[in-house]
């Protein structure tokens, strides 16, 4: 099975999970490609902590006489309003557990029981006076702003953002981090994972029998009796005709033969409307070997969208490589010298996460495949480039002498006949083609 286009749009959901309670702390969904669907994630610290930061508090009346009461109340946790408010004042730091080999050399960062922060230098992000940072970790975690000053609700917001390394990482499975409060004494630990769930917009086609095979029928013949029946007037002695209810019949499913004939007829109509002199005496032949389609480069006006429009959500059913494109049209990206002949006009694209939607009935032919939309994030981070095309069936145009030679015993001309595809003859004059 061919690899999907990197410009394909998916429904991407990012999930933050509290590891200690195995509960979902946050889920954020968006439409985008696997290259640009990296939103800013928001979660409250208490959703990562739950009840795990609630140390046992001794009742002073139950303390044995002579014992020293070190603390009458904890100053962190999520049980009470006071604890949540006090918790806002503590710095915190975050240590990765997904790649222990990438930590500082000679430093043992421990395991989950240490929050992966068994030694200083293991922390890669956080909100603390020493500004923990990293050049290789996948996320940054900072304190957000809370509109709830009373802390009756959630008032310890955290903001997670993906780094450049995180956008380039493989997210086939969840990745774990440990978060610790920086305080005198023991620094409490919260463990959380970040995972990505990807689903296609278009439901996948079920495997099974080829549905085209039962439709292998020859082209149907036109009925010759329809006009005769319509001109006959029934003989009757009745003074008024009887009303007969209309008979409704469902549309008849045409066979493969009719589909192929319709494809050639549509090509003929397009050619006849463009250059009727060429259709006076010719043969149009549908190519029976792949590639069955070809792309004709055209100039057109695409739309620039910040979010993928509905036209971007479909996956092209046709397959086309850049080598099957001819003509000259609009190119996007950095086009290598080997393909610059396809470009009548070249644009570098746009910065940021934009989607360039091809006009209705057209596609972008990229060196990574066919797509209705270009993700600028993919284009800017890869060596991909694209050409705006119309998609046409490969129907060849022949002079009548070329076909006659197949039935004659001897060749009736000396020079090699020239065969062209109809798409090349039209040169992309009809926006949208006939195969789109």
UniProtKB/Swiss-Prot annotation:
Q: Which classification does the entry list for the species?
A: Viruses, Riboviria, Pararnavirae, Artverviricota, Revtraviricetes
Which GO terms of the cellular component aspect does the record hold? host cell plasma membrane; membrane; viral envelope; virion membrane
Per the record, where are the segments of Polar residues compositional bias? 219-240
User: What's this chain's function?
Assistant: The surface protein (SU) attaches the virus to the host cell by binding to its receptor. This interaction triggers the refolding of the transmembrane protein (TM) and is thought to activate its fusogenic potential by unmasking its fusion peptide. Fusion occurs at the host cell plasma membrane.
Protein name, entry field = Envelope glycoprotein
Q: How is it modified after translation?
A: Specific enzymatic cleavages in vivo yield mature proteins. Envelope glycoproteins are synthesized as an inactive precursor that is N-glycosylated and processed likely by host cell furin or by a furin-like protease in the Golgi to yield the mature SU and TM proteins. The cleavage site between SU and TM requires the minimal sequence [KR]-X-[KR]-R.
- Taxonomically, the superkingdom here is Viruses
The listed location of motif CXXC is 282-285
Please provide the record's keywords in A-Z order: Cleavage on pair of basic residues, Disulfide bond, Fusion of virus membrane with host cell membrane, Fusion of virus membrane with host membrane, Glycoprotein, Host cell membrane, Host membrane, Host-virus interaction, Membrane, Signal, Viral attachment to host cell, Viral envelope protein, Viral penetration into host cytoplasm, Virion, Virus entry into host cell
InterPro entries cross-referenced by the UniProt entry: FMuLV_rcpt-bd, TLV/ENV_coat_polyprotein
* Disulfide bond annotation, renumbered to this chain: 95-117, 109-122
The keyword Hydrolase belongs to this UniProt entry's keyword annotation: no
User: From which organism does this entry originate?
Assistant: Feline leukemia virus (strain C/FS246)
Which region is the signal sequence?
1
Does the UniProt entry include the keyword Membrane? yes
Q: Name one GO biological process term.
A: symbiont entry into host cell
> Where is carbohydrate linked to this protein?
11, 26, 237, 272, 277, 304, 344, 360, 380
Q: Which residues lie on this side of the membrane: Extracellular?
A: 2-436
């Amino acid at each position: 099975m061919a690899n999907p286009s990197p410009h394909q749009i998916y429904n991407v959901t990012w999930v933050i999970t509290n590891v200690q309670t195995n509960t979902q702390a946050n889920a954020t969904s968006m439409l985008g490609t696997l290259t640009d669907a990296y939103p800013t994630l928001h979660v409250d610290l208490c959703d990562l902590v739950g009840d795990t930061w609630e140390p046992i508090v001794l009742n002073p009346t139950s303390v044995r006489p002579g014992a020293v009461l070190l603390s009458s109340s904890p100053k962190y946790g999520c049980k009470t309003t006071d604890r949540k408010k006090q918790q806002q004042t503590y710095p915190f730091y975050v240590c990765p557990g997904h790649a222990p080999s990438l930590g500082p050399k000679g430093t043992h960062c421990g395991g989950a029981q240490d929050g992966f922060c068994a030694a200083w230098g293991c922390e890669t992000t956080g909100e603390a006076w020493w500004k923990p940072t990293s050049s290789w970790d996948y996320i940054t975690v900072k304190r957000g702003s809370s509109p709830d000053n009373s802390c009756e609700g959630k008032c310890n917001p955290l903001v997670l953002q993906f780094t450049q390394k995180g956008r380039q990482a493989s997210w086939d499975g969840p990745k774990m981090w440990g978060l610790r409060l920086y305080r005198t004494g023991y620094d409490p630990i919260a463990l959380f994972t970040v995972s990505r769930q990807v689903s296609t917009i278009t439901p996948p086609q079920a495997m099974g029998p080829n549905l085209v095979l039962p439709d292998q029928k020859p082209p149907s013949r036109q009925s010759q009796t329809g006009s005769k029946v319509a001109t006959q007037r029934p003989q009757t002695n009745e003074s008024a005709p009887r009303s007969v209810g209309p008979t409704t019949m469902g549309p008849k499913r045409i066979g493969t033969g009719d589909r192929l004939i319709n494809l050639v007829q549509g090509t003929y109509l397009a050619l006849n409307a463009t250059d009727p002199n060429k259709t006076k005496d010719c043969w149009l032949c549908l190519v029976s070997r792949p590639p069955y389609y070809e792309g004709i480069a055209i100039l057109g006006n695409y739309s620039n969208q910040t979010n993928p429009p509905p036209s971007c959500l479909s996956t092209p059913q046709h397959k086309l490589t850049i080598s099957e494109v001819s003509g000259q049209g609009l190119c996007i990206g950095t086009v290598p010298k080997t393909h610059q002949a396809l470009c009548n006009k070249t644009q570098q694209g746009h910065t940021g996460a934009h989607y360039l939607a091809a006009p209705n009935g057209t596609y972008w032919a990229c060196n990574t495949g066919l797509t209705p939309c270009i993700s600028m994030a993919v284009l800017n981070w890869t060596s991909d480039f694209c050409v705006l095309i119309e998609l046409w069936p490969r129907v060849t145009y022949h002079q009548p002498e070329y076909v006659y030679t197949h039935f004659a015993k001897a060749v009736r001309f000396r020079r090699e006949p020239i065969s062209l595809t109809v798409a090349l003859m039209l040169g992309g004059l009809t926006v949208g083609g006939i195969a789109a």
